[in-house]
Amino acid sequence: MFQNADEAKKLIADEDVKFIDVRFCDLPGVMQHFTIPASAFDPAEELAFDGSSIRGFQAIHESDMAVRADLSTARVDPFRRDKTVNINFFIHDPITGEQYSRDPRNVAKKAEAYLASTGIGDTGYFGPEAEFYVFDSVRLANSATESFYHIDSEAGAWNTGALENNRGYKVRYKGGYFPVPPVDHFADLRAQISLELDRAGLQVERHDHEVGTAGQAEINYKFNTLLAAADDLQLFKYIVKNVAWQNGKTATFMPKPIFGDNGSGMHVHQSLWTGGQALFYDEAGYAGLSDTARYYMGGILKHAPSLLAFTNPTVNSYHRLVPGFEAPVNLVYSQRNRSAAMRIPITGSNPKAKRVEFRAPDSSGNPYLAFSALLLAGLDGIKNKIEPAEPIDKDLYELAPEEHAGVPQVPTSLPAVLDRLEADHEFLLAGDVFTPDLIETWIDYKRTNEIAPLQLRPHPYEYEQYYDV
């Protein structure tokens, strides 16, 4: 919104803005904020906060951190009562003035600079497609004496026998793709979200009900450069959740909220450009792909087992990545084939539209780190001319066992991908984009705060299985 500090001050005064919402991203990927009066905001000044209270940041004995405004990200918040402008900030060390190596937005900024320094290209475009579910309610409890979750949705397949306010038109399990209303209960909600996205500067291309029951949805908007695309995704999630909340609903981007139905993924479309020219198109190549694009895919497929530590970084991610629910578990590439982890969309002969789509990711993690890791893996493939295995255009779910045995698969758990990241992360250190400290912190955080607590707790299904042993 703002190009410089003077422009920011003028607009804040002219538009009678009351508050500035200071936003930055924690290490796991959740946006944080604090709010200051607009009258106290000086775009040129740093603001301080306690880094020891932010997940994945500082220890208590070195907790002071500072943020500096990225004025290009300023947006009026449509959900606040008093006029508020949200601005994303970069994090700095207040003593040295250096950019903080664990600041996810700084990682994305360094990734873009590294791309330009390689001479391969000057711009990377990323287009995530984040699916989500819409529920009426969610209840959960975890204590020493109880553990459960309960979700409900007026459109849920499990509510066909509900006694009250049941007018039918429930969405069957794995049967939600493209039905018209009244089976599609949430067309108006998605339309309202789409209008808010457009007002926020995200150009919506389409919205639809996805395959899952209970309001699973997808809203696609225009791609962007790496850092901006990650900012856009955080803004997208903020708008989706708040519009749902305003309508008495609750939205979740959890990868697998419903057992027995499709999970929610985040397919990521990617392309490289230089001097305004697309680098991924060659009409003579398979599916119209250039050598550069093929090597880029080769890098991602080679490093995928460690990449998933950033693109699929939760325990719940691996409940989605199982055969039978349209999940891309096969580490191969193909034209059109949605059972492959890497797909080349049909885009005709337009070089500018040629891109590759990595289908494994979900949106439970940190988009700044995920997109940066994907770019670095792809660039490693280009620099080292990593050839992917031959494309497979068959339905990979229907291969004979002997054929399927030769197809590489994604790892099946978060501990497995963290082990792979520990062994394979040199490509992430290029250009000092990721630091060894960041990678070590990420692995330790996931093991300590997400894996270990689950290992300590009995699961409700264990009672069903083992109570009467």
Curated annotation (Swiss-Prot):
Chain positions recorded as ATP binding sites: E205, Y221, K222, F223, H269, Q270, S271, R338, R343, K352
Compartment list: Cytoplasm
Annotated EC: 6.3.1.2
Documented activity regulation: The activity of this enzyme could be controlled by adenylation under conditions of abundant glutamine.
Subunit structure: Oligomer of 12 subunits arranged in the form of two hexagons.
Keyword Phosphoprotein recorded: yes
Binding of Mg(2+) 1, residues: E129, H267, E357
Protein name as it appears in the record: Glutamine synthetase
